[in-house]
Amino acid sequence: MIMEKIRFITDSASDMNHPREDVTILPLHIRFGDDEYADGVTISHREFYEKLIECDTLPTTSLVSPTVFEDAYEQAVSAGETVIVITISGKLSGTCQSARIAAEDYEGKVFVIDSMNATIGERILVEYGLQLKDQGKSAEEIVSILEKEKSKIHTMGLLDTLEYLKKGGRISSTVAFIGGALAIKPVVAVSDGEIIMLGKARGSKNGSNFLIREIEKADGVDFSRPFCLGYTGLSDELLQKYIHDSEDLWKDYAKELPISTLGATIGTHVGPGAVAVAFFEH
């Protein structure tokens, strides 16, 4: 029996690092003024945050075009591979629509999944797909399972500053000023494919406790499936502090915790100093 060759394609919004040979990452584009960069290709996460901290106007990100997807599909299908595409939420970017348009000529060969998520929440859905592939599941079985299980992913984060929400027009200057003076730390989550405010906490310690309670509400982390911790900015200091404060959540996990830097797609809107966690509920 010939083993089905399966390739996963995702976008750079997934913040995947060190991908396997069977994963293709297509970059979104980031524009700072007149300068455009391919996310993770011509600009690293570190370089992105160095520029973000210096600029007064927020950069913009643009979708992966249908042509780029089509080229990737053609290459994979020509090599005898079945393709599973997992994209950032269609409510946050037109990338999923691009992937679907390009897939119209590849019926039965290319399957597109809207992760209804972003950053490390999207990443762990890809990683779960790889886990299922390694268990010998077919492409159709993997797609069916991922479509069913993607709603069980929780992605949430604690922001260090309101400055970037203000720059992006999501809150007023007055709210940002008062919030800064009171050391207000917003807690956000991805819900039904959109980023929502879960609540606010005063100070980092209360923010960490808020995040811990939200994870406990979801019955904790399912360590049998992929999960990931992430941070924005040039240092993981605040993430390490959060891990220390929430050590009871991770005590059943014997290996090194999976940690990722969060790139431009989320970093643009939340700024440096945010910490995030994505996991499957039990």
Where on the chain are the PLM-derived regions?
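Class I S-adenosyl-L-methionine
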Residues: 36-105
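Conserved beta-strand elements of the Class I
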Residues: 7-9, 84
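Mixed-charge interfacial surface used for oligomerization/domain docking
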Residues: 2-6, 13-35, 95-111, 117-127, ...
